[in-house]
């Protein structure tokens, strides 16, 4: 997203009908440490940040944190064709984390702010 906000596009269209859980690799790594500290745990653990967002909402937050004034307009998946189909809902349930008594994943806003600060000093 940051490379798209280079000032050459007056308006960016970003998909607003696909929902997911934006997640940083740092948040995943921290939770993996918690899981690995409990060798008796078995099963599939979904490691996604708390909260949900569309790609449009995610882009808006990225630009806000970066102090960019890039104009962003929502569009539909049909208006933004991709080589492979994308799911409308890629949200994952973190029930296994709760059942294992592990700490929750951070909210995606907080994880994104941490990433932006470390990568872009924003």
Question: Which positions does each model-derived feature cover?
Answer:
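Residue-level signal for alpha-helix termini/capping positions
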Residues: 5-7, 36-40, 120
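Hydrophobic residues at beta-strand termini and immediately following loops
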Residues: 14-15, 47, 75, 108
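Non-catalytic, hydrophobic alpha-helical segments
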Residues: 28, 32, 47, 58, ...
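C-terminal amphipathic/interface module of NAD(P)-dependent oxidoreductases
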Residues: 53, 88-122
